[in-house]
Design a protein with these regions (language model features):
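Conserved C-terminal beta-signal and adjacent last beta-strands/turns
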Residues: 6, 20, 332-358, 515, ...
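Gram-negative outer-membrane beta-barrel transporters
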Residues: 354, 436-443, 564-571, 591-683, ...
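Outer-membrane beta-barrel translocator/receptor signature
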Residues: 102-104, 116, 125-134, 139-208, ...
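Acidic, small-polar-rich N-terminal luminal/periplasmic segments of exported/outer-membrane proteins
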Residues: 26-160, 550
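Outer-membrane beta-barrel domain signature, strongest for Gram-negative TonB-dependent receptors
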Residues: 211, 217-354, 360-366, 562-563
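Solvent-exposed loop segments that connect transmembrane elements
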Residues: 205-213, 250-273, 317-327, 369-419, ...
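Membrane-embedded beta-barrel scaffold of Gram-negative outer-membrane proteins
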Residues: 286, 290-294, 298-316, 506-522, ...
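Structural signature of Gram-negative outer-membrane beta-barrels, strongest in the C-terminal barrel
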Residues: 227-231, 344-346, 358-360, 422-570, ...
């Protein structure tokens, strides 16, 4: 920690986007955020927060979380598909599809939690800004913000008539279109806004099984919003968000068995069963109502009401081969209702703060069907005994027709499934305040208490016919899943608290320092597990994290450069990890991996060198590992292992060069570079011989824009991953539990052109 503090004291960086208002102005525009539930300049916020305006996102072509992550130190996004993201802040990942498990990183869309994994991926379009807060944020944001929060603030309807339309195309058959239109329905009182985004792109991996493609994209997002201002004291916003995702299948490619005529490299052709039937069909609908009312000059009442409904079906080939042995799907249904009431106090005096109540109700289910050809599965499981998996011509071996275990027939098709269910009802009470001790020193403190009722359920639907090759005696009559004989449920009540304490000191008019301590918490995990030959409720203790950090923020060079730096250290207790179950079923299980520690530092800068050149950069260092021993002094199973999806070093930088293109207009060139050091895809870094990892790599992107005079038109040409760098975004997966890990390739070189017309 001392070394990191020294580095902090020697560093100068930046944290906010810029804007230029004509060539005569060479300075950064003030950037206001609401990270602390009040409007304030980002340089005055004593939190490690990185925020970007919508204009910056558009300039760099950022339309998704995975595009955003490289420009936020401490943020790592793995997006296998819209149905299966992994969101990592400072080394801690949230990606569980179990509807009874809470997230570690919260995502909020206009103040409403959208954190549940299967419904959290949304397109980033027509945004006012995005704020990414690192460290425990439960006091400010509530559920799921154990180690960080992503806050999306969408553009609301405004008093005016304006719009724009964008259309473009690119390689891999890409077609895209987006647009916004804002209008006035009643002068000075009622306004409406509509925005949409559509992207369709073929997959970059060919599936030679039927000529279909994998790793593509097909997403439509639509948003409508109304704003009503009946008077100067009241503003009411009503927002409807809709998103439909129908991409082709994910390229889970086997690293063990090559496709016919190919190899096991993740970046080349795959041969997956079901062909074009693989893929995702996901629909997300969200309704949001926000009302703010100034009670008087001191108090403001805010109400945020949210409703979300989403369903997502994904069919995937878990073995990553032409073998018909591990054919899975996931059918997820989720519904949630939330309400927050908050009263804020601010007279521009020494004290300001807020207090409130919130309610959250959520229900979800994840149904997982499993299909297999028992003849092929038997050959695969007996391969160590000399049974060939494939025939000499490369076709799967279906010669085993009688089970060596049961003596019964082995069938060409058998199906079984399980369903996990979860329900949460929670009530929060919270308070947070800031007191200016002097003109230079301010102290902040916050507290949130949560009362929650959690229900977890599990049910197995037995095989169509008794399994010919059960993988364990307890599983019969099924192949993989031990029967439950109906739905098994358990309910528990929990009470908890989180808090923060912060001190901010204004060193000068341009520089301030802060120090904070905060407590984060992930609720107890309630599982239905198979123990001792029967299903029983199993509780894993709540995860607790204590986070400590110090930071500096400021501006320099006459407000031409913004910079920020922070050093952090956190201590985890009862850190939960996913591991292969030594006594299945199930194949994998959630375990208490004990204690863990993380430390690091984060740096950002952004500035304007002159009217023609602007620049930005970020750097992050994260050392997050499992401790050697637990609280009892016993050596931990994962001692010394690095958290999954955690690069020790990440950085990004770029610049925008602007200039006149004669009388025709202006041109802009924006090159950018992003780098991630080596990271693992499993908390057990040695799993599968340590091959479940990605070495350090960098991606170079470039954008060129032409703006004719009048600023109505803009044409942009772009290339992402200019040098066509090969890298993987995940490894292991379900196939890894059977000793045949699969690998997913990242995007290759993508390029295209888009044109925008503003009116």
């Amino acid at each position: 920690m001392r070394k990191l503090t020294t580095l902090l004291a020697l560093s100068v960086f930046a944290a906010t986007p810029f804007a230029l208002h004509g060539e005569e102005v060479v300075a950064l525009e003030k950037f206001v955020v609401t990270s602390q539930k009040r409007t304030e300049e980002i340089k005055d916020v004593p939190i490690s927060v990185t925020a970007y305006k919508g204009e910056f996102l558009n300039r760099l072509g950022i339309g998704s979380f995975k595009d955003l992550a490289p420009y936020v130190p401490g943020l790592f996004i793995q997006e296998q598909s819209p149905n299966n993201p992994g969101i990592n802040v400072r080394g801690v990942t949230t990606d569980s599809g179990n509807p009874s498990q809470e997230t570690r990183v919260s995502i909020f869309q206009d103040g409403v939690s959208i954190s549940r994994s299967r419904g959290s991926v949304v397109e980033l379009f027509d945004l006012e800004r995005v704020e990414v807060l690192k460290g425990p944020q439960g006091t400010l944001f509530g559920r799921g913000a154990q180690i960080g929060a992503i806050s999306i603030i969408q553009n609301k309807a405004q008093n005016g008539t304006l719009g724009q339309f964008t259309a473009g195309f690119g390689n891999f058959g890409k077609i895209e279109a987006s647009g916004t239109y804002n209008t006035v329905l009643a002068p000075n009182q009622l306004f409406a806004r509509v925005a949409f985004s559509y992207v369709d792109r073929e997959g970059s991996i060919e599936n030679v099984a039927d000529g279909s493609d994998l790793n593509g994209k097909n997403t439509l997002g639509v948003r409508t919003s109304l704003r009503w201002q009946p008077g100067t004291a009241t503003t009411a916003d009503f927002i409807i968000n809709y998103q439909r995702d129908q991409p082709p299948g994910t390229a889970f490619k086997s690293g063990t068995f090559a496709p016919r005529g190919g190899n096991t490299r993740a970046f080349e052709t795959a041969e997956l069963n079901r062909g074009a039937e693989l893929g995702i069909d996901r629909t997300v609908v969200g309704l949001t109502g926000i009302v703010t009312h100034d009670l008087n000059n001191a108090f403001t009442l805010t109400s945020i009401t949210g409703y979300r409904d989403f369903d997502s079906f994904e069919a995937f080939d878990a073995d990553g081969t032409r073998l018909n042995i591990l054919e899975f799907a996931e059918d997820y249904l989720g519904e949630q209702l939330s309400q927050e009431l908050r009263i804020s106090y601010d007279t521009r005096g020494r004290f300001r703060g807020f207090a409130g109540l919130s309610y959250f109700d959520e229900k979800g289910s994840a149904r997982v069907p499993f299909y297999t050809d028992e003849r092929q599965l038997a050959a695969f499981l007996l391969r160590g005994s000399g049974v060939p998996v494939f025939n000499p011509d490369g076709t799967p071996n279906t010669g085993l027709t009688v089970s060596p275990i049961t003596g019964g027939p082995l069938r060409a098709y058998n199906r079984e499934e399980y369903t996990q269910t979860g329900a949460t009802e929670a009530y929060d009470i919270f308070v947070d305040g800031t007191y200016n001790v002097t003109d230079r020193l301010e102290l902040s403190a916050g507290f949130r208490s949560t009362f929650e009722d959690i229900t977890s359920g599990y049910q197995v639907i037995n095989a169509l016919t008794p399994a010919g090759f059960p993988t364990g005696a307890a599983n019969f009559p099924n192949t993989l899943f031990a029967p439950t004989n109906g739905l098994i449920q358990a309910t528990r009540d929990y009470n908890s608290w989180v808090a923060r304490a912060v001190a901010r000191y204004k060193i000068s008019s341009d520089i301030s320092a802060f120090a904070s301590a905060s407590r984060g918490r992930r609720p107890d995990t309630l599982l239905i597990s198979f123990v001792g030959g029967r299903y029983v409720p199993v509780e894993l203790k709540e995860e607790i994290v204590w986070n400590y950090e110090v930071g500096l923020k400021g501006t320099m060079l006459q407000n031409r450069l913004n910079w920020s730096a922070a050093v952090f250290k956190y201590d985890y207790a009862n850190f939960q990890s996913t591991a292969v179950n030594p006594t299945p079923p199930p194949l994998t299980t959630t375990v208490d991996a004990g204690n863990a520690t993380g430390e690091g530092f984060e740096l950002t800068f952004q500035g304007v060198l002159n009217p023609a050149v602007t620049t930005f950069g970020t750097f992050g260092y994260t050392d997050a590992t499992f401790d050697d021993v637990n609280d009892r002094g016993q050596r931990q199973q994962l001692a010394g292992n690095t958290f999954r999806l955690t690069s020790r070093r990440t950085y990004s930088f770029g610049a925008t060069f602007s200039g006149s293109f004669g009388p025709a207009g202006r041109i802009q060139l924006t090159p950018s570079y992003q780098y991630k050091s080596k990271h693992f895809f499993d908390d057990n870094n040695a799993n599968a011989g340590g091959i479940l990892s990605q070495d350090g790599f960098g991606l170079f992107n470039v954008r060129a824009a032409f703006q004719p005079k009048g600023d109505r038109w803009e044409v942009v040409a772009y290339i992402d991953n200019l040098f066509d760098k090969e890298y993987i975004i995940d490894a292991g997966n379900t196939g890894g539990a059977f000793g045949i890990p699969t690998f997913i390739a990242g995007d290759p070189r993508l390029f295209g052109v888009r044109a925008t017309y503003r009116f």
